[in-house]
């Protein structure tokens, strides 16, 4: 997803475009990995001195509810990234830098076979480790 796609989603849901929202979205697009709210606040503070965590978190939750960003817990902290594809997939997440790699394989079909009679409504699979760059 790019910034324009995200802005389109905001507008389709009756939400207004603001420079702050665009700048937050730009951070996600540029980073393309899991980042925490503190990092977003630090980057945003350069153009919006004194921007509050409330503003950051309010927009993070809005973006998440609209499917613009994804979230995960890494090292006991909530982190966020831009939604990367429209197809079903999972992620490998580097525990050191937060970089992600798409895993196109999904084990849910095999799991469904071992759970006859149940309806699975949703699932999430994340694989954690250390990426090639961080192993050096």
Curated annotation (Swiss-Prot):
Keywords: Cytoplasm, DNA-binding, Iron, Metal-binding, Repressor, Transcription, Transcription regulation, Zinc. GO terms for biological process: negative regulation of DNA-templated transcription; regulation of secondary metabolite biosynthetic process. GO terms for molecular function: DNA-binding transcription factor activity; transcription cis-regulatory region binding; zinc ion binding. Residues 86-136 are annotated as: Dimerization. Fe cation binds at residues 88, 90, 109, 123. The keyword Nucleus does not apply. Transmembrane segments: none annotated. GO terms for cellular component: cytoplasm. The keyword Iron applies. Zn(2+) binds at residues 94, 97. Residues 1-85 are annotated as: DNA-binding. InterPro entries: FUR, Fur_C, WH-like_DNA-bd_sf, WH_DNA-bd_sf. Coiled coil: none annotated. It is found in: Cytoplasm. Belongs to the Fur family. Acts as a global negative controlling element, employing Fe(2+) as a cofactor to bind the operator of the repressed genes. Homodimer. This is Ferric uptake regulation protein. It comes from Staphylococcus aureus (strain NCTC 8325 / PS 47). The gene is fur.
